[in-house]
Structures are given as C-alpha cells and as structure tokens.
From Swiss-Prot:
Organism, scientific name: Schizosaccharomyces pombe (strain 972 / ATCC 24843) (Fission yeast)
Keyword Phosphoprotein tagged: yes
Keyword NADP: no
Annotated keywords: Cytoplasm, Cytoskeleton, Nucleus, Phosphoprotein
Gene Ontology cellular-component annotations: cytoplasm; mitotic spindle; nucleus; site of double-strand break
Stated name of the protein: Uncharacterized protein C651.12c
Annotated spans, Disordered: 1-32, 50-124
Basic residues bias spans: 1-10
Amino acid sequence: MSSKKVKYNPRKSASQNEATSASAGSKAFGFNSAKKEKLHRMALSMEAIEDVEDQSFNGKSSNLVRKRRGLDEDIDEFSSSSEDERKPARHPQSSSQKPFASSTYNVELPTSPTKITNIGQSSPRALRYLSPESQRIKNAKMKSPISTHLAKYSIHHMGTPPSKPSFLSSSVSSPASSKQKSLFQCTKDLEKRYINRVHRSSETELVQLSSIKVLDRFLSDIYLVEAEKNEEKCTVLLLKRSNTDVDNSSSLSLTLPLCKFTKNGHQVHIHPC
C-alpha cells in the first residue's frame, strides 16, 4: 500500500494546509469525503436546531418573568390605593373650600342622643335618614293586607271601613226539604258519571254483564244485567244516553223505566244512563 507524501506549502495558511492533509489522509486510508461532508452538515444542523430551541425557551421564560413582575406591581399598587382610601381625612375642608357648601345644607350631626331626638322631632326627614330601618318597617306595614284594607277608605275619605266577614259564625240552618232536594240533585249528578248501573234486589247483586243491542231506535250499546227477584229473573238494560234518547230527568234515578217488555220469560227494563 503506497502512501503519498504531502508537501508543505509556506504560501498557504495553516488551516488550508490542515484541510489538504486531512483530504490526503482520507484518500490514503479509503474514507469518502462526501460522507464526511454530509456528517459535518448534519452536525451543524443539529447545533442550529438546539440554538433555536434554547432561544425560544429563553424567550418564553423571559415573557413569564415579565408578566409576573407586572402582576406584582399591579397588586402592590391596588393594595396601596385601598389603604389610602381607608385612612380618614385628618384635615377636612372648610365650608369655604367646598364648591356646593351653604348654610342651609351644612348641618353638623350631634353626638349626644338628646340632640338626635330633638332633630327627629323638628325634622322627621333627618331622623329617617339616621334610621333607615324604621322606614323599612313603615313600608312593610303599609303593604300589609290590613293596612291596604284601611287605606282604601282613608284615601277616598269614606269614613270608618266596614268590618271584615267572619267565617267562624254559624250559618243559618236550611230546612229539611232543601237538604233532600240537594241530596237528590247530587245523586243524579253522580249517576251521570256511570255508564253501568248495578241493580240491587233483596241484597242480591246483578251477576251477569254482557253487551247486546236491542230496539233499533237506540243508537248506543246496551249492557244486559240479570238478577233474581221473587223467583223470577228480571233483566235491566242500562243504556248510554245519546241525543236521540228521550230526555226524562226521573229516569236518572231508575224510578221510571224508559221501556218495558218481556223476552224469553224475562222482564226487561230499559233505563238510560
């Protein structure tokens, strides 16, 4: 393996001589200069990326520090201003220095309770200003139902208001006939709510219930109910009231049937409901 000798040129700089020797050594030992240059460029790019990351991180941290300092300054300024507001004024302005001062409105509030009562007696406006709770109580009393009831007559100058009705007094007892009539009316109203009626005879309840249609002049379903009465079967047909039915108020209490006939040895009574 033959090695080439590198001549030193005194006219060239030291860096150029080193580069020449490095290229000669790489060629002597079989290294590819293109690969070396590629690796060198990659190293430079990595260093550039790291520099950019460091700069961005430092910039973010500096922004955070700057914001924190500004926030601390705002807090200090706010606390100092609130403390200044809490401190009472040691040297109040005189009446001549105030822009809207006058002898009528420049009233000094007394410190003793006797003077306060005197002010309240002379001017109720000042007392109301000193005690706002009394004004709230007065407003609440004015809004109460009794006060409203009394105010209606006092405003219109109608004199003494009449007494309110008392619900504790006993009402006048109604006669027995009116009670029976109202009870009968209630019974009829209750019967209107039912479609099926139960016919009772000698404590025997109707047992069979079925739906059939009889008599063409009735346009609704008829409910068939059978019961024993004096060893004879009595059939009661309960009919849903329609516009074509005969309006008979007495039929609501099953006193007068609308129709009677005999069918297969059974007595049939038709009552609308």
